[in-house]
Amino acid sequence: MALTISETLRIGTRGGATLTGLGDVTGALEVGRRADIVLVDLSGVHCRPVHDPRAALLYSVRSTSDVHSVLVDGDLVVADRRLLTYDLAQILSDADAIAAELVDLSRGGTIQHYAP
């Protein structure tokens, strides 16, 4: 039996919150709960026509390019598709430096094995 759009959204919101033990603080837009909100841009041609915004969210939205803004516990962390809370360039630079150290410590060996 297929899930309805409403059931699928409920699983992704209230259900996800419940499974992570946060069902009493998040998972729904209600007074007293954390305001964890993702604002999605449905204006792209891949989202058109929008007969049902819920269906567009589930079937058409691209995971990163359509996310416009994000609030976590009411705090704006992404605005106009830009991360506000961390310096992404610095994070990537730090990660590259750590990876280089790991390669150096491996004495020329592999630091990660990928099965064929």
Positions of the model-derived regions?
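Active-site microenvironment of metallo-dependent hydrolases
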Residues: 10-116
